[in-house]
């Protein structure tokens, strides 16, 4: 009554398996194959859905709180613009780049200088006292050398005068040694520049001499030839030839006339 049913299945959901998709040639056509049927050594043994796990719901500020914060900031800005409120300036620290720029302006290396040696960093309090900078100390500071400026200058006290007398010769010795070293380095630089300048002059002179010699060498053997030709022209044989040619150059009528007169 009923025909024989064919074997096999229709491929329902119960017959589907992602492991079979891995070996299928058309696996790229299956939706979600990169997560459910990963192929390759970079996907094996890794959690490919890590981005969807461990997320805690972050409760941000409500709309009313945001509006209140904006209004407060606008009110403070208005008061500062009208002059009713002082603006709080946050001090910015000196970064490494700024420190290097300051050292370059002073004319020294940043490694040789310290922060306490730079001018304009911080201010001394009133209790420290007045700092005296002599002419030599100022010169040393311009050269980028360390100057001891932490001693006080007070009118009274024998101990302070003795300490200052001890410190002065040290500073003077430092400045003298620094000046001498600076002069020596300048002299050496000048000598090197002079040597380089002399070498360059010698090279230029050699280069100028070479083309002059090259141009003068081919013209030298031609000169005696011209002199030889002139000497030949001045010889008596050449003079006779010239006379003969000059006589032959006369017109034929003149020649016949001369012959008739001779006859």
From Swiss-Prot:
Keyword annotations from UniProtKB, A to Z: Isopeptide bond, Phosphoprotein, Ubl conjugation
Cellular component aspect of the GO annotation: extracellular region; ficolin-1-rich granule lumen; secretory granule lumen
Compositional bias segments (type: Basic residues): 183-209
Region (Disordered), start-end ranges: 1-21, 105-132, 148-263
UniProt biased composition (Basic and acidic residues): 105-116
MF annotations from Gene Ontology: RNA binding
Modified residues (Phosphothreonine): 215, 219
Composition-biased stretches (Gly residues): 1-11
Organism: Homo sapiens (Human)
Bias type Low complexity, positions: 117-132
Coiled coil: none
Protein name stated in the entry: Multiple myeloma tumor-associated protein 2
Residues that bear Phosphoserine: 123, 127, 164, 216-217, 220
Name of the gene this protein is made from: MMTAG2
Domain of life: Eukaryota
